[in-house]
From Swiss-Prot:
One of the Pfam families matching this protein, by short name: Cytochrom_B_C
Keywords carried by this UniProt record: Electron transport, Heme, Iron, Membrane, Metal-binding, Mitochondrion, Mitochondrion inner membrane, Respiratory chain, Transmembrane, Transmembrane helix, Transport, Ubiquinone
Family: Belongs to the cytochrome b family.
Gene Ontology CC annotations of this record: mitochondrial inner membrane; respiratory chain complex III
Main location: mitochondrion
UniProt-annotated location(s): Mitochondrion inner membrane
Protein name: Cytochrome b
Length: 379
């Protein structure tokens, strides 16, 4: 009699995905972030579910319901801060996961990559709507500023914005629908994650050398299960240090002031994980141009497989491309920092230059360097 995990219709799917899955023998810790993202999603859905039990999506009571969760609900404070800082961990893992894909040429699995980019957009949309829910000053003004960007779309822009708002400004209708979508999207994301994995398992994982690893595979369990658990423990440790020692470190103090449409905060800025996109948006003086740059700064990931001109898949043996990759990382860190600064003298020009550099490295330089390396090595 065969083992039930290999014969049962449901268990055999799990078995072929997480237990007997052949995996390359040399994938490094950079490959841990996929499983960490799965755990992050689970943590966010669970904490979010318990928060939703006590939250009210009404402009009059939203702010005080969050206060009530922190003060009166059993362990409500830890639920709230796990959810808020869990989002930060989610984005740290996301950006590392995408960076890993860029570095090691994982984008050559086009279907997996494209679903991944759509997932990135979905998670960003979810995080944005979640930030609006506590109905603090930064929630309200962030929602106003970001939704207002859609008015830059020619002809239908204004109607579109008012349709999203459900009125002539960000108000009760907006908050209610944002709560509905913030609750719904993570489940859609979960379904898309399954599709992401389905496409990945069609090809199998890439590895740091970028060379096919069909001749040297090991079972996922126990080797990578134990490795994933180690990564998970490290991530939980960092998350708990954030939550228990400095839960508000990544938040904005303005969000502890209830939303007031008559009083604009001095510096409207999003959470840290959107600052790079916000800086790129601000660096273009034209409204429509800024919105296009904002969307394209992330949508550019879609065309990365087309720009791949090297004969090698991974950057492991391409020093020139490595330099450009780390230059891009440094550039995005600098853009993130500028996004948090006020619109003043040195920051404006620096932000514009960094945004131009970010786009130029991603489009022109990466492709040119790969081609040059190929030419130099006379392939």
């Amino acid at each position: 009699m065969t083992n039930i995990r290999k014969s049962h219709p449901l268990l055999k799917i799990i078995n072929s995905s997480f237990i007997d899955l052949p995996a390359p023998s040399n994938i490094s810790s950079w490959w841990n972030f996929g499983s960490l993202l799965g755990i992050c999603l689970a943590v966010q859905i669970l904490t979010g579910l318990f928060l939703a039990m006590h939250y009210t999506s009404d402009t009059m009571t939203a702010f005080s319901s969050v206060t009530h969760i922190c003060r009166d609900v059993n362990y409500g404070w830890i639920l709230r801060y796990l959810h808020a800082n869990g989002a930060s961990m989610f984005f740290i893992c996301l950006y590392i996961h995408v960076g890993r894909g860029l570095y090691y040429g994982s984008y050559m699995y086009t279907e997996t990559w494209n679903i991944g980019v759509i997932l990135l957009f979905a998670v960003m949309a979810t995080a944005f709507m979640g930030y609006v829910l506590p109905w603090g000053q930064m929630s309200f003004w962030g929602a106003t500023v970001i939704t207002n960007l859609l008015s830059a779309i020619p002809y239908i822009g204004t109607d579109l914005v008012e349709w999203i708002w459900g009125g002539f400004s960000v108000d009760k209708a907006t908050l209610t629908r944002f709560f509905a979508f913030h609750f719904l999207l993570p489940f859609i994301i979960s379904a898309m994650v399954m599709v992401h994995l389905l496409f990945l398992h069609e090809t199998g994982s890439n590895n740091p050398t970028g060379i096919p690893s069909n001749m040297d595979m090991i079972p996922f369990h126990p080797y990578y299960t134990i490795k994933d658990i180690l990564g998970l423990l490290l991530m939980i440790m960092v998350l708990l240090m954030l939550v228990l020692f400095s839960p508000d470190m990544l938040g904005d103090p303005d969000n502890y002031t209830p939303a007031n449409p008559l009083n604009t905060p001095p510096h409207i800025k999003p959470e840290w994980y959107f600052l790079f996109a916000y800086a790129i948006l601000r660096s273009i003086p034209n409204k429509l141009g800024g919105v296009m740059a904002l969307v394209l700064s992330i949508l550019i990931l879609i065309i990365i497989p087309v720009l791949h001109t090297s004969k090698q898949r991974s950057m492991t043996f391409r020093p020139l491309s490595q330099c450009l990759f780390w230059l891009l990382v440094a550039d995005l860190l600098x853009v993130t920092w500028i996004g948090g600064q006020p619109v003043e003298x040195p920051y404006v020009i620096x932000g514009q230059l960094a945004s131009i550099x970010x786009x130029x490295i991603x489009i022109x330089x990466x492709x040119x360097x790969s081609x040059a390396x190929x030419x130099x090595x006379x392939w």
